[in-house]
From Swiss-Prot:
GO molecular function per UniProt: ATP binding; dTMP kinase activity
A GO cellular component annotation in the UniProt record: cytosol
Family: Belongs to the thymidylate kinase family.
Protein name: Thymidylate kinase
General function of this protein: Phosphorylation of dTMP to form dTDP in both de novo and salvage pathways of dTTP synthesis.
Gene: tmk
SUPFAM superfamilies: P-loop containing nucleoside triphosphate hydrolases (SSF52540)
Enzyme Commission numbers on file: 2.7.4.9
Binding positions for ATP per the UniProt entry: 10-17
Amino acid sequence: MNGHFISFEGPDGAGKTTVLQAMVEHYQQRLKDQLTVTREPGGNPISEAIRTIILDKNNTEMDERTEALLYAAARRQHLVETILPALKKNHVVFCDRFVDSSIAYQGAGRKIGTDAVYQMNLFATEGALPEKTIYLDVPSELGLKRIMTHRTEDVDRLDLEQLDFHQRVRSAYLDLAKKFPDRIVVIDASQELDDVKRDVIEVLDQILN
């Protein structure tokens, strides 16, 4: 089996992590120890330490560019320590977020500029991108409603942003999907969960079968 790098993306409230876990359960028996599941920011001790700083809701004074640079630093370490070694072993890598998240959240959400953040991350990753990206799309209003309903005890600093921030994030994701149609597959995440899982499995089966 050849290695495959697959990322899962989506605005807050899209159910991304829930869907990713369902995909792990679906493919675990088939792939066994050839499946590597990781997340961003995180995936190794250094990147997890950076994650704690980024998402701490007490860090309200964090500058936008500081945030973007921290994400890029965590991503670099994640790539060289976790993702690339797994791919060299011909593993399938399921990654909860990658470069597209920074472009959407810091580039558009924080208004730093999507091109600037893209170039920053090209430097960090030396151009490495997922083979396929599953983008779970949900209207911002619905996403925020889900956050407040289901995640009241586990809300991080980015979840606390206002509606216009999340609308900019979603718009940037959709722009990326238009720019990279061969890599990014848009899934309607406003559907029932079983329907979302069915659509994602249909995409992944084309890669993994």
